[in-house]
């Protein structure tokens, strides 16, 4: 019988091979339970290793984001339908921090606060994900604002110019045209986009927070009709969305824009509006049982907006030279810009455009209050011709408003004051502009030059806008080289002389045509009781003798 031999080396090798090839089928995951849920908020017990802003998954697949990390429980904002979440259900960690998909495929699309498409055009092929809570560029990564972002609005580009990388607040009561100013700015980027020049192209993001779904649909229709959706992304969180979505939507829009900014591209982001985001954040914070402060807002409501708007920047050449311009919108109550949220955002931004209800009701649109509107850094980026002609415009309008208020009570004014009132009324008329009809910068320069230099003083106030329209058309056909020179940034004696000659020639044609129309019009029949008004008026002006007494 053969002797049994045991080789320890073989046994050890067999065991090592078995152990090295073994794969455990058991997965490790942290699981917690829902302590209570309601109003879009859930309090979860357990999960001690959860990170701030980490995504958590409920039993029905709904996601939530961890905002409050207390010793015993976690405060979670539910991102979706919270009707199926009940006490006692299991919650597990995902290990992922809240992020949004980004990429060029988002242009022309409408997405929700999580970056998911809601326009029915299918999935979006993203280029990756970016965290929503990324640090803003530091001081060394930035450079000063030195490139203009033209809005196409004469009053804005002349008096409160905006530069690429600037944060310019649009503030005013409801129904004063705040959204219209922002949409005009988006529409004015169309020619730059179609030029194909990456240095001129501006990608636009419109963030709609707390608006009616029908309003968002109409805004999309305006952009599509003007051909602006091809370079615009809409991030929509309508009034029907939970408060958590309204709180996150501006960060999603900013994240999509940051992807392009760090890629060396230029971006414009409109936040419409941050008042509703602050209200949504207040609701979320109170439901999370955070201590309330002034007007029941949480103590970090300033940080809510500062960390969002600080992401707007003009990057240095070493960082690619991209930019992200922010146009936050804030709604005031009774024109009170000293309220809590308005003063917060005013202190964060680089200037504000204040739209006033009284001016809007008077037909001055855009209804910009010159006295309280300012741009702190955009002047450095203003084009040279506009800077030359618009220097006195703000002062003239401010003096006109002051004199207008005085003239309402004064019976007689000196000649200089009357002349100032006449010119001021023409400047106000000149700066009026229809909705969704932005002006090229060279035509803005011509209009502002004509008004500030007194070339319109002999044109009736009611005819100013018609004169402007026809004169610009005349220049486009007869003096195209002058407009091209201004567009190229040229301004000097030669261009001024050409404009002087052109406006004199056109004025003769315009006034001659007007006189001819007046002659051909049949005399208007006086209304009852007005037969003697002309005589009385002429007597008051001193142009006729006193009527004989009976």
From Swiss-Prot:
Q: Which InterPro entries match?
A: ATP_synth_asu-like_sf, ATP_synth_asu_C, ATP_synth_asu_C_sf, ATP_synth_F1_a_nt-bd_dom, ATP_synth_F1_asu, ATPase_a/bsu_AS, ATPase_F1/V1/A1_a/bsu_N, ATPase_F1/V1/A1_a/bsu_N_sf
> What is the membrane topology here?
Peripheral membrane protein
- Biased composition regions of type Basic and acidic residues, renumbered to the chain: 528-550
- Site annotation (Required for activity) points to 373
Catalytic activity, EC: 7.1.2.2
UniProt lists the family membership as follows:
Belongs to the ATPase alpha/beta chains family.
In Swiss-Prot or TrEMBL terms, this protein is called ATP synthase subunit alpha
Source organism of the structure: Salinispora arenicola (strain CNS-205)
């Amino acid at each position: 019988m053969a002797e049994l031999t045991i080789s320890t080396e073989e046994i050890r090798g067999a065991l090592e091979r078995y152990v090295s090839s073994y794969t455990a089928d058991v997965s490790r995951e942290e699981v917690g339970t829902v302590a209570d849920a309601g109003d879009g908020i859930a309090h979860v017990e357990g999960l001690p290793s959860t990170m701030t802003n980490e995504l958590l998954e409920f039993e029905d697949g709904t996601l939530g984001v961890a905002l409050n990390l207390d010793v015993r429980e976690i405060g979670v904002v539910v991102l979706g339908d919270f009707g199926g979440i009940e006490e006692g259900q299991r919650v597990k960690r995902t290990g992922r921090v809240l992020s949004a998909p980004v990429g060029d495929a988002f242009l022309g699309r409408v997405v929700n606060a999580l970056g998911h498409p809601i326009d029915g055009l299918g999935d979006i092929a993203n280029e990756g994900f970016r965290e929503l809570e990324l640090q803003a560029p530091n001081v060394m990564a930035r450079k000063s604002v030195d490139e203009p972002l033209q809005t196409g609005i004469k009053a804005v580009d002349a008096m409160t110019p905006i530069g690429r990388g600037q944060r310019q607040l649009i503030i005013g009561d409801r129904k004063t045209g705040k959204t219209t100013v922002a949409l005009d700015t988006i529409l004015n980027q169309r020619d730059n986009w179609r030029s194909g020049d990456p240095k001129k192209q501006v990608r636009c993001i419109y963030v709609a927070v707390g608006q009616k779904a029908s309003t968002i649909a109409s805004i999309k229709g305006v952009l599509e009709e003007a051909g602006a959706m091809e370079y615009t992304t809409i991030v929509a969180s309508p009034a029907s969305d939970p408060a958590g979505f309204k709180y996150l939507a501006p960060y999603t829009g900013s994240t999509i824009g940051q992807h392009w900014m760090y890629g060396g591209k230029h971006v414009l982001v409109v936040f419409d509006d941050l008042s509703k985001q602050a209200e949504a954040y207040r609701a979320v914070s109170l439901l999370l049982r955070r201590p309330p402060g002034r007007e029941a807002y949480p103590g970090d409501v300033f940080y809510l907006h500062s960390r969002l708007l600080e992401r707007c920047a003009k990057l240095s050449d070493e960082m690619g030279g991209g930019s992200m311009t922010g146009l936050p919108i804030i709604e005031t109550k009774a024109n009170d810009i000293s309220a809590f949220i308005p003063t917060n955002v005013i202190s964060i931004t680089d200037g504000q455009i204040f739209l006033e209800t009284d001016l809007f009701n008077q037909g001055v649109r855009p209804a910009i209050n010159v006295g309280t509107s300012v741009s702190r850094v955009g002047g450095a980026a203003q084009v040279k011709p506009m800077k030359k002609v618009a220097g006195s415009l703000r002062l003239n309008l401010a003096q006109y408003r002051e004199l207008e208020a005085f003239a309402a009570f004064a019976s007689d004014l000196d000649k200089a004051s009357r002349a100032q009132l006449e010119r001021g009324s023409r400047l106000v008329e000149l700066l009026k502009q229809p909705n969704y009809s932005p002006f090229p910068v060279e035509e803005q320069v011509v209009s502002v030059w004509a008004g500030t230099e007194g070339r319109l003083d002999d044109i009736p106030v009611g005819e100013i806008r018609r004169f402007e329209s026809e004169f610009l058309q005349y220049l486009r056909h007869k003096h195209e080289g002058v407009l091209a020179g201004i567009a190229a940034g040229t301004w000097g004696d030669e261009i001024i002389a050409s404009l002087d000659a052109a406006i004199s020639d056109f004025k003769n044609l315009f006034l001659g045509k007007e006189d001819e129309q007046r002659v051909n019009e049949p005399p208007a029949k006086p209304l009852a009781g007005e037969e003697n008004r002309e005589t009385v008026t002429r007597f008051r002006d001193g142009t006729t003798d006193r009527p004989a007494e009976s």
